[in-house]
């Protein structure tokens, strides 16, 4: 798939998500008003990206930003704890992130996924993000810190959308995240529902929980809690290879999601499974890239190698970095893609490219 076709694919994906969200929030005037306004911003962003494409460049439609490595939980097999995380002192400042958000808006980037660690530990960065209404900021949180003040903040800034991470039901969630965590996340969802906020859930899919998380009962329970978005993230085998889905598991997940999309009101997203339709991996700026807490521009969260820092470089410079350019041009991202993480399987190769720009 060339960049022209890819641009249209990504644009169509964002427009489809906005239309789905509008349809699912018609009974909520505040949410509908926000989504209509955001839909206009999406069109303007598409026009900006198209201008760049006409000049032979390419701007991805979204970014992933891990704004902190700090966390209030100690989940079993946590990817962020396996990798060498930056210290608090090394993390990007509010001003650093503000510069990134400003340039993202100017380039036509429509969404920035905020992750961690626990992103709610960086209230200063969330406050900074609230200033950029043209960008959608899904905030991937464990939900423990979602107190009344935090819910009020999200109510006032509806372009920041809480996405609460769970592992499925109570037994599975507490087994990985700690006793009592599931109850606290359900209470957080209750609070968000009381404010009629658009929010979602994120589930890391493993061989252990696959059969549970794709059950009708699981989806129904989340819908009843007020959840409008459900993101399925395939487990990347950083700690326990046996937990990673095999081809049969990925096929089952794909088939169940196709069935659920036909009859459910939820917005259902699979990552990286949905990338298959784009002709390959979207990392390294092809569809997105990852910014770690210290500012390193990485191909994706599961390929933690960088040759460029956003503390000193611009987003445009990061997109044109030697590492990203080589990955996009040498075929490492393109071709048959059947789920899982393409670059994780090429870790040594990516690391070598980053070390030898």
What do the predicted segments below correspond to?
Residues 2-149, 157:
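Conserved alpha-helical substructure of the radical SAM core
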Residues 94-114, 120-233:
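Radical SAM/AdoMet-radical enzyme domain recognition
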Residues 63, 285-287:
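Short loop/turn microsegments at loop-to-beta-strand junctions
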Residues 1-10, 174-284, 293-298, 307-310:
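Radical SAM enzyme [4Fe-4S]-AdoMet core and its adjacent flexible, acidic
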Residues 40-60, 275, 309-326:
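Short, charged low-complexity linear segments at domain edges
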Residues 21-24, 297, 301-357:
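Flexible mid-to-C-terminal extensions adjoining Fe-S/redox cofactors in radical SAM and related proteins
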Residues 71, 75-78, 281, 295, ...:
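Short cysteine clusters
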């Amino acid at each position: 798939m060339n960049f022209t076709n890819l641009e249209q694919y990504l644009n169509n994906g964002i427009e489809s998500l906005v239309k789905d969200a509008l349809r699912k929030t018609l009974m909520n005037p505040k949410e509908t008003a926000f989504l209509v306004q955001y839909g206009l911003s999406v069109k303007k962003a598409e026009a900006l990206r198209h201008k760049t494409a006409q000049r032979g460049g390419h701007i991805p439609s979204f970014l992933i930003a891990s704004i902190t490595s700090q966390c209030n939980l100690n989940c079993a097999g946590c990817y962020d704890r396996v990798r060498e995380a930056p210290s608090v002192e090394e993390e990007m400042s509010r001003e650093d992130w503000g510069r990134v958000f400003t340039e993202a808006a100017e380039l036509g980037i429509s969404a920035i996924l905020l992750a961690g660690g626990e992103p709610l530990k960086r209230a200063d960065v969330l406050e900074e993000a609230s200033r950029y209404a043209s960008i959608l900021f899904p905030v991937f949180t464990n939900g423990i810190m979602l107190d009344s003040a935090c819910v009020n903040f999200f109510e006032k800034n509806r372009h920041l959308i809480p996405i609460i991470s769970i592992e499925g039901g109570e037994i599975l969630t507490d087994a990985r995240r700690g006793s009592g965590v599931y109850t606290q996340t359900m209470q957080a969802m209750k609070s968000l529902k009381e404010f009629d906020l658009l929010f979602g859930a994120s589930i890391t899919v493993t061989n252990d929980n696959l059969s549970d998380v794709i059950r009708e009962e699981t989806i129904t329970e989340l819908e009843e809690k007020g959840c409008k978005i459900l993101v399925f993230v395939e487990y990347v085998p950083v700690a326990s290879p046996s937990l990673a889905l095999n081809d049969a598991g990925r096929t089952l997940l794909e088939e169940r999601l196709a069935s659920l999309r036909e009859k459910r009101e939820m917005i259902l997203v699979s990552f990286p499974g949905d990338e298959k339709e784009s002709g390959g991996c979207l990392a390294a700026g092809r569809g997105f890239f990852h910014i770690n807490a210290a500012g390193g521009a990485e191909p994706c969260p599961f390929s933690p190698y960088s040759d460029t820092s956003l503390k000193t470089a611009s987003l445009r410079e990061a997109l044109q970095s030697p590492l990203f350019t080589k990955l996009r041009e040498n075929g490492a991202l393109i071709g048959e893609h059947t789920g899982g993480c393409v670059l994780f399987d090429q870790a040594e190769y990516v690391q070598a490219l980053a070390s030898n720009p």
